[in-house]
Amino acid sequence: MTNNTKTITLNLGPQHPATHGVLRLILEMDGEVVNNADPHIGLLHRGTEKLIEHKTYLQAIPYFDRLDYVSPMCQEHAFALAVESLLECEVPRRAQFIRVLFSELTRILNHTLNIGSQALDIGATTPLLWLFEEREKIMEFYERVSGSRMHSNYFRPGGVAEDLPDGLLEDIDKFIEQFPPKLHDIESLLNENRLWKQRLVDIGVVSQKEAMDWGFSGPMLRGSGIAWDLRKSNPYDVYDEIDFKVPIGKNGDCYDRYFVRMLEMYESIKIIKQCIEKMPKGAVKTDDPKLTPPTRAKMKESMEAMIHHFKLYTEGYDVPAGETYKAVEAPKGEFGVYLYSQGGNRPYRCRIKAPGFAHLQGLDFISKGHLMADVITIIATLDIVFGEIDR
């Protein structure tokens, strides 16, 4: 008696809400079990790297907000660090603390969306509603500091665009006081929930060796038990002055990755608290007039200041020839920017390293042997956003 099995090919996406963007996933299935998962990317490709070659260094910043549009300021941070490395310019301490403060608010912004939408994919509606209420408060902080809720365009090579408005630090302080109890409420719903654990525990297991071999970073790497965090291993701005822990998992499954993200939010709260306590007075931009535009007050008094402002924003500033690679610990993993300058006001080459790109490549081996329903859980726990993958 012969046992002939016939596999079926299933198209998941690119319109399916559980694909978190424009993922087209071709699944080869034996009944309900996944044999192969082939992700098709490129549906959100906009040629960002090529566009940046035709823009000045200041005009390039808004493009980084539109990569991982869930955590925009972390992308800006990497680009600002790369340009500063080529310029060899000093960043005022107040600006460094503001950057770290908003990078950690961005981490909370990212993880609240990820955990909320992951719970929704599995069938739990309440966490999404509660967490979106908290995200709204952070988006208001974004709006108050930059004028925009999502695409902030706030970080600059040499500092930040504007100083914090009056009362903002006090409001952020109030937010981080009331936020931990909300996280405890989410944990009380999910951590020991029988259905949640059945859907996450031992699903999508990634060993330490696999995580290293595939170039994973962020919660995907730390969930497998590897304590690698660029804020600790290669600190930038004032992270070396701040005390925090790097949460890690044990088993490398979906539950561990969820838990790592949960613990990271508590650590972000600690970092934000320290930033508020240590925030110095002073300038928020470098004092080099070639990089920093004149103030509005000066422009109203001086025609030269007006001309300087116009030329800075139309022609930009020249960056010395050279190359650099700078990476930040973005919420999804290591987000890196490689810049190559031949001198002049535009980069010759800008290469963007997106953490989600490596994570999506691993989807095939992670989902092999799992059920179709588990693939939805795995996609959610990868935390992929196609703005940064397709670029």
Swiss-Prot record:
<dbReference type="GO" id="GO:0050136">
    <property type="term" value="F:NADH:ubiquinone reductase (non-electrogenic) activity"/>
</dbReference>
<keyword id="KW-0830">Ubiquinone</keyword>
<keyword id="KW-1278">Translocase</keyword>
<keyword id="KW-0997">Cell inner membrane</keyword>
<keyword id="KW-0520">NAD</keyword>
<keyword id="KW-0813">Transport</keyword>
<keyword id="KW-0874">Quinone</keyword>
<comment type="similarity">
    <text>Belongs to the complex I 49 kDa subunit family.</text>
</comment>
<dbReference type="Pfam" id="PF00346">
    <property type="entry name" value="Complex1_49kDa"/>
</dbReference>
<dbReference type="GO" id="GO:0005886">
    <property type="term" value="C:plasma membrane"/>
</dbReference>
<dbReference type="GO" id="GO:0051287">
    <property type="term" value="F:NAD binding"/>
</dbReference>
<protein>
    <recommendedName>
        <fullName>NADH-quinone oxidoreductase subunit D</fullName>
        <ecNumber>7.1.1.-</ecNumber>
    </recommendedName>
</protein>
<dbReference type="InterPro" id="IPR029014">
    <property type="entry name" value="NiFe-Hase_large"/>
</dbReference>
<dbReference type="InterPro" id="IPR014029">
    <property type="entry name" value="NADH_UbQ_OxRdtase_49kDa_CS"/>
</dbReference>
<dbReference type="InterPro" id="IPR022885">
    <property type="entry name" value="NDH1_su_D/H"/>
</dbReference>
<keyword id="KW-0472">Membrane</keyword>
<comment type="subunit">
    <text>NDH-1 is composed of 14 different subunits. Subunits NuoB, C, D, E, F, and G constitute the peripheral sector of the complex.</text>
</comment>
<dbReference type="InterPro" id="IPR001135">
    <property type="entry name" value="NADH_Q_OxRdtase_suD"/>
</dbReference>
<keyword id="KW-1003">Cell membrane</keyword>
<dbReference type="GO" id="GO:0048038">
    <property type="term" value="F:quinone binding"/>
</dbReference>
<comment type="function">
    <text>NDH-1 shuttles electrons from NADH, via FMN and iron-sulfur (Fe-S) centers, to quinones in the respiratory chain. The immediate electron acceptor for the enzyme in this species is believed to be ubiquinone. Couples the redox reaction to proton translocation (for every two electrons transferred, four hydrogen ions are translocated across the cytoplasmic membrane), and thus conserves the redox energy in a proton gradient.</text>
</comment>
